[in-house]
Curated annotation (Swiss-Prot):
It is found in: Secreted. One of its GO terms (biological process) is adenylate cyclase-activating G protein-coupled receptor signaling pathway. The modification Lysine amide is found at K164. It comes from Pelophylax ridibundus (Marsh frog). Residues 1-22 form the signal peptide. Gene3D superfamilies: 6.10.250.590. This is Glucagon family neuropeptides.
Length: 171
């Protein structure tokens, strides 16, 4: 029920909005005036600054934007912007081509194991990461075992070293 009411309300709102904006009064609103002449503080008439009958948004919006761009920026700046945009597009094209080439090479070498992953790392990097992780985990296990043995056997080990007259040291 709520969705139907919302749909009807949006439909009525859209129709009302379209009729208001397409009416002749709405299009000529900026040109309408209460008085024909405007006076300043001294009583002199001011020039008429009424808007055109065609508002800016009614014509071609792209041409209005181009006119504003050419009005605010000199030709040299526009040319420099164009050169920068062209160089940036070329750079992005090269980067995407390079990424595509790496992906093709990885597929050719068999590095991509499944189509669900979008990893395009080389196989050697993944392999070296795995070796490092494995070595580091072994090292951590060895350190944990040494620490455990030092805690369990620490008292007997210290006593044996002290009896021989040497310095105290753990494994």
């Amino acid at each position: 029920m709520y969705r139907k009411a919302l749909l009807v309300w949006l439909l009525v709102y859209g129709i009302m909005r379209c009729t208001v904006h397409s009416s002749p009064t709405a299009l000529k609103y900026p040109a309408l005036r209460l008085e024909d002449e405007v006076y300043d503080e001294d009583g002199n008439t001011l020039p008429d600054f009424a808007f055109d009958n065609n508002p800016i948004g009614i014509g071609n919006p792209a041409s209005v934007f181009d006119d504003m761009y050419s009005f605010y920026y000199p030709a040299e700046k526009r040319h420099a912007d164009d050169l920068l945009n062209k160089a940036y597009r070329n750079l992005l094209g090269q980067l995407s081509a390079r990424k595509y080439l790496h992906t093709l090479m990885a597929k050719h070498l068999g590095a991509v194991s499944s189509s669900l992953e979008d990893d395009s790392e080389p196989l050697s990097k993944r392999h070296s990461d795995g070796i490092f992780t494995d070595s580091y985990s072994r090292y951590r296990k060895q350190m944990a075992v040494k620490k455990y043995l030092a805690a369990v056997l620490g008292k007997r080990y210290k006593q044996r070293i002290k009896n021989k007259g040497r310095r105290v040291a753990y494994l």
